[in-house]
Amino acid sequence: MFREILQKTQTELYDYLIDKLKEKGYDNIITTAGKYEFIASKGTIPIVLVAHLDTVFKEGNRSQMLIYHDSEQGVWWSPNGLGADDRAGVYMILQILEQTNLRPHILFTTDEESKATGASAVCGKKQELFGDISYIIELDRQGYRECVFYECDNPEFEKFIEGFGFTTQSGTFTDISIICPDWEVAGVNLSVGYIYEHSRIEHFYEAMWKDTYKKVVKMLETKCDRVWKYIPKEYDTQSDIYEKLMKIYNNSQKEKKSNGKGSKC
């Protein structure tokens, strides 16, 4: 299934996912008529799983792209640019639906890499799409066992997420950077096993992905009736803002040295 997901254009994947959700019992699927912006469907668990459908690479004829898979090492790569950012997140959501009876709320977005079309389109629509929710999990972070909260400053929520085996890191942007403050619900972005994203040497590691998969299943199995509130970070002085910008800059320089291309989220 992962190869099939990698080889689809965003539009092809959009249509494919609607059919997949229907197969798994999601009968109330909401999209924007005539537009490829988002796919939303309400489940029975009040946690929203989010992944985006686009990649940074020119789509062309992705069905003909070269994909290499070392099955012994569990590593995937492509000279065309793999696009595991964020097809790895899409794959994880589908595998949860395939391998378990868990049915969380689902949100697939489009154009996260360019103009955040999908994330912007769901602003103001929380009640319409899902009603009350506990928190949001985006599956769009590079690496292994990392969690990112962006501008959400809820220490209790951070501790709750770290309790599943993740370590907090800083990040710059993904869909929940827009969605969480608009919906006033806390959210987290979790590692899904790709590295060197946004480059032709992007690699995807199955072992890293499986580790997060197991943790997300545990999170969905953990009964949580409370609503985790989005608490915005406050920057009271120019020095606070400068400190934040320097932290982001320094982290990006470290990632460039280690990854060759830096990291977006």
Stretches found by the model and what they are:
Residues N80-I161, T168:
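Acidic/histidine-rich catalytic neighborhood of metal-dependent amide-processing enzymes
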Residues E23, Q95-H105, E128-G131, K214-W228:
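Secondary-structure boundary elements
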Residues F2-I45:
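A non-catalytic alpha/beta surface segment that caps or lines the substrate-entry region
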Residues E23-T32, I67-D70, F164-T168:
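Short secondary-structure junctions
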Residues Y196-C265:
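His/Asp/Glu-rich mid-to-C-terminal helical/loop segments that flank catalytic regions of hydrolases
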Residues E59, V90, A116-T117, F173-I176:
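Short glycine/serine/threonine-rich phosphate/pyrophosphate-binding segments
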Residues F57, T167-T212:
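Zn-dependent metallopeptidase/amidohydrolase metal-coordination segment
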Residues I30-T31, S41-R103:
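Active-site metal-coordination/substrate-binding segment of hydrolases
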